[in-house]
């Protein structure tokens, strides 16, 4: 067992205990406010400011890719342990728009970034030697000057990114220190390594033997954080849904990606349709949090499972599907509506698709003129989440067992695609026959035939999505991004892994405060890139789209211009 000192919402530090068991995917304890649904400055995961450790690396980090203005101060010790001296955010208020409004977000960044940076200056660790050139004087106190400035360069909203990037450049120039302009999704993927570094006890860190070398006047930190490469990362947020094989710091192979909208966007849309308006807009959320947010996905989870709030041992009553045939069966409710899993007709295609389920929910409510009782709405919320979470989890299984196929496959042996549009969930007025049920029954029959001919299928088509040589086995799956804070998602993924023979595969889930956008993860990505010898030129610009995969069109993290070796 180890303890990381966490501060959630605006409360004092609270201890969060983690288990070394690979079967657990969440903290055994954390504050009942699972989400930072706030439009005010929030503290999260901070330690008390102390004197800087000799030989450590210190960075000030900025994140402004969307609607959260985030600043952090992070220190990495020679042992590999980390101290988070400051980590705060301001979330812009978009309630009037029902979603993120670009201009409102930029104005919020412009108004709040400088005050947050000023607060961060006061949280810098004290400098023991106030006569050297690494000292900053803040309110008459000698503080340690950061070794470099970390900032998100992309992907994200260009104007928002530019606000943070230009501020970071100014500090780097003023302090005469390097700039590290990092990839936002890389930062999410590396977050569990930050969590493991924060969780190291001081005694354990002091006792651990480390190998140190010299690069200029700073020390190279040799301790390898956990999880070690390779591992699978499921990155799920309002703007991204991707399954990634993280092979190395800058090598993240995309195994599956969303064909249309991201899962976070889909959950927000479904929440606006399913959750009663008075719960969605007019009053406090079910966490008793008095603030209201346009991040409706967390509200959907709380609405679906109100008794789960604050109960870490909540029984969801979930039984994972035993076979692929079970996975693609439509859910037929006693109320007369049906939900069909995404891409059921595509076999084991490595892709994600969420617009269809969104259309099905819309059609169900439209056909009832939105006159749906509360209990039925809760059922719809639960089953919608279950279906899309199983859709995510099955792609993890395909990657682990090597049976996933390239994403651009056509439906096999005929069989019309059940995309979940209104026409597919409505009854055929001429025959009274449910089109979705009939189509899915046909697909199940096809898959049974396909299973019987498995050897012939594997001989005709590649069995994996990757043509690389045999790689080390995957021992860890990481859930990261804002949607990864959904505890029902964690439960579904863990349950499916256990049921399909992967109980020995660890599921790493950062605390909710580190799943959503934050500057601590940006600082950690900067620390890892800095230790690997990378720096950013001062002429770099914000990038709206920036891939992770070095085999992608843009060459991945290192494929764009602006990188220099330190």
Which positions does each model-derived feature cover?
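N-terminal mitochondrial targeting presequence
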Residues: 1-56
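N-terminal beta-alpha supersecondary unit
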Residues: 55-145, 151-155
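Short beta-strand scaffold segments in enzyme catalytic cores
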Residues: 68-75, 190, 233-235, 241-245
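Conserved phosphate-binding/catalytic loops in two-lobed NTP-binding clefts
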Residues: 181-182, 475-477, 493-522, 536-540
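Conserved phosphate-binding catalytic cores of ATP/NTP-utilizing and phosphoryl-transfer enzymes
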Residues: 182-231
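Glycine-rich phosphate-binding/hydrolytic loop that grips phosphoryl groups
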Residues: 188-191, 510-552
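Glycine-rich phosphate-binding loop plus the immediately following alpha-helix
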Residues: 246-319, 354-368
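A contiguous, well-structured pocket-lining segment that forms one wall/lid of small-molecule binding clefts
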Residues: 302-434, 444-477, 486-498, 558, ...
